[in-house]
């Protein structure tokens, strides 16, 4: 908040040994004066009192990411110890806090004495060093990549600032010695270019709009690609709003209105058979980032995922409409505007094809059921919250799964061959694909505008594929499909990856299944000598009883729930791994694959 409001330009985060972290800025420094009511320093108030952040003083910050004003005090409460150093007015101050255990209870964030003047300085700013409490965070360690991703995002959103991340942890604690510096002069324009780096844009530079009115700042960048899905990422006061809100609604409305007006004014829609262009046509292949800043933020719910301020919608719509109209009517923008309208007309033709296909399906009343005959082995349970759909690779494994399942709650949908790569396909091509038609019918939610989460027939959707390259590819294709066209299934926690065992250890009547090399090594040593070892190359090698016991039985199985921690990074990863460009994919593989990894099974068997 300090640097975002222009009171500093640099924040440096350092990860140190023993899971200690330090955060330093060159802002004004936390107030050190004695609070008139509480009779302690401003530093102590900020780090020990809830709702004491600067955002509750309207003169402190014009815009703040804090909704509840609890960040500093909660960090202190959840730390074994915390040290604050303030550099202000030529002086250096310091205060220490700790969380001792007294009579079996933790006293969190207790001051160790009062704020002390410890020296003179020419610096300004605040430095906080802390160690997360291991009594709360048992085995949690700072993840460099997660922190780096968030810092990169903040740097894109605040083009004037520099964010530095240092990894000074020793090697035995996972330290790398890396330093990452994030500073982007182009702001959101650079952000969109970063997201679209592995895509083919239909015009070179993103359209970048900035405006301010009534104390609200609006910053928008957008660029269209040859892809088929829209990707809109929105933020308010640097906080991601993955569920959108009034700022997204205003942006979409402005785009539809301005693009339509331009197309009509310049007589660009000459195909009379084409239905009227709508908002989703203009947003096909669009990547956009929307960032608004305002004082009194209203979120829907406590999780800050959806902006609720009603006044933001008309304001964003007005400002984006005005600036976008000005841009499109520049002589230099003529080719860009025409490409956007041409892309939208292609989307409208596809939409018309999809609509006609849906109408045809409705006329054939039993089409959905017909799609499933001989493919889906449904379950008898009538309550979706208890029902599970296993999407199983191959007929062989599908047959074993059908025999071994719990028929009351578990349905089986075998996949024959690899499904279509949806990242390279339009929606009408996807709907022509038999595997995806069957899957859509089985889930019951519909697709696109027809999608309704309340119609979901199975609250657990479990992808079961072999642990080889083909299995990994099938998982990636299915996850791409859910991310692109049924993202709500992921965000609501319905999509899982089944984890079949890699190995079977047997000694006489004793059998153990192992899910990774480390588990195999531990159990192998416990078994001693004279055991047999089997590696499962595919699900089809397991009989129905084995598949049930290891992979489908709710009491024994291991499932990984699919989540989206960062939508922009997920978008970029999918574009890299599943898109048309092979070079970024090759670079990703070279960076992340371990080509020197030893085959542990071969080592065990052959010594």
What are these regions (language model features)?
Residues 5-7, 32-36, 402, 474:
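Conserved ATPase-coupling elements of RecA-like P-loop NTPase cores
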Residues 33-53:
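Short conserved segment of the HATPase_c
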Residues 38-41, 70, 246, 434, ...:
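A generic structural signal for residues located within well-ordered alpha-helices
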Residues 349-368, 383-388, 399, 403-405, ...:
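C-terminal interaction appendages of subunits in large macromolecular complexes
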Residues 31-37, 137, 240-246, 312, ...:
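Flexible beta-alpha connector loops of hexameric P-loop NTPases
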Residues 39-43, 144, 475, 479:
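Amphipathic alpha-helical segments in well-structured domains
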Residues 36-38, 305, 404-407, 476-478:
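Short, glycine/charged-enriched secondary-structure capping and boundary segments
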Residues 1-20, 24-26, 45, 49, ...:
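GHKL-family ATPase ATP-binding module
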């Amino acid at each position: 908040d300090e640097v975002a409001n222009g009171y500093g330009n640099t924040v440096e985060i350092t990860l140190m040994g023993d899971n200690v972290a330090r955060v330093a800025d060159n802002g004004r420094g936390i107030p050190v004066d004695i609070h008139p009511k509480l009779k302690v320093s401003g530093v102590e108030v900020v780090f020990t009192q809830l709702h004491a952040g600067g955002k509750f003083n309207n003169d402190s910050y014009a815009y703040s990411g804090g909704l509840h004003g609890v960040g500093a005090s909660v960090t202190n409460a959840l730390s074994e110890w915390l040290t604050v150093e303030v550099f202000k007015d030529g002086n250096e101050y310091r205060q220490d806090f700790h969380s001792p255990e007294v009579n079996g209870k933790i006293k969190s964030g207790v001051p160790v004495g009062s704020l002390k003047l410890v020296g003179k300085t020419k610096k300004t700013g605040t430095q906080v060093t802390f160690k997360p409490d291991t009594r709360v965070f048992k085995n949690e360690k700072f993840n460099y990549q997660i922190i780096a991703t968030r810092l990169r995002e903040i740097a894109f959103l605040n083009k004037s600032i520099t964010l530095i991340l240092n990894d000074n942890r020793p090697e035995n604690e996972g330290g790398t010695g890396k330093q990452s510096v994030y500073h982007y002069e182009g702001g959101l324009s650079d952000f969109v270019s970063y997201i679209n780096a592995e895509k083919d844009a239909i015009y070179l530079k993103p359209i970048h709009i900035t405006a301010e009115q009534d104390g609200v700042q609006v910053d928008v960048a957008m660029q269209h690609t040859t892809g088929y899905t829209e990707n809109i990422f929105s933020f308010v006061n640097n906080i991601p709003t993955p569920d959108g809100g009034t700022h997204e609604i205003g942006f979409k409305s402005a785009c539809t209105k301005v693009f339509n007006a331009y197309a009509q004014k310049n007589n660009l829609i000459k195909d009379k058979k084409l239905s009227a262009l709508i908002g989703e046509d203009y947003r096909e292949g669009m990547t956009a980032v929307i960032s608004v800043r305002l004082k009194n933020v209203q979120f829907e719910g406590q999780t800050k995922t959806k902006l609720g301020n009603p006044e933001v919608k008309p304001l964003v719509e007005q400002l984006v409409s005005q600036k976008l109209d000005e841009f499109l009517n520049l002589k230099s923008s003529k080719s860009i505007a025409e490409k956007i309208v041409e892309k939208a007309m292609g989307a409208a033709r596809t939409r018309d094809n999809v609509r006609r296909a849906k109408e045809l399906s409705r006329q054939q009343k039993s089409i959905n059921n017909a799609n499933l005959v001989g493919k889906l082995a449904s379950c008898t349970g009538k309550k979706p919250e208890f029902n599970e759909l296993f999407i199983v690779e191959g007929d062989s494994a599908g047959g074993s799964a059908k025999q071994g399942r719990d028929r009351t709650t578990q349905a089986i949908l075998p996949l024959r061959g690899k499904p279509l790569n949806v990242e390279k396909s339009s929606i009408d091509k996807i709907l022509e694909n038999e595997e995806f038609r069957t899957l859509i019918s089985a889930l019951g939610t519909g697709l696109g505008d027809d999608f309704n989460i309340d119609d979901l027939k199975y609250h657990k959707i479990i992808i079961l594929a072999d642990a080889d390259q083909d299995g990994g590819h099938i998982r990636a294709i299915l996850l791409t499909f859910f991310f692109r066209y049924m993202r709500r299934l992921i965000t609501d926690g319905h999509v899982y990856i089944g984890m079949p065992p890699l190995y079977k250890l047997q000694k006489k009547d004793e059998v153990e299944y192992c899910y990774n090399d480390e588990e195999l090594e531990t159990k192998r040593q416990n078994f001693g000598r004279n055991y047999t070892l089997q590696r499962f190359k595919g699900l089809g090698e397991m009989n129905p009883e084995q598949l049930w016991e290891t992979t489908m039985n709710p009491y024994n199985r291991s499932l990984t729930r699919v989540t989206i921690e960062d939508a922009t990074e997920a978008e970029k990863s999918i574009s890299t791994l599943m898109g048309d460009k092979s070079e970024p994919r090759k670079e990703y593989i070279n960076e992340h694959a371990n080509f020197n990894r030893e085959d542990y099974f071969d080592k065990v068997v052959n010594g």
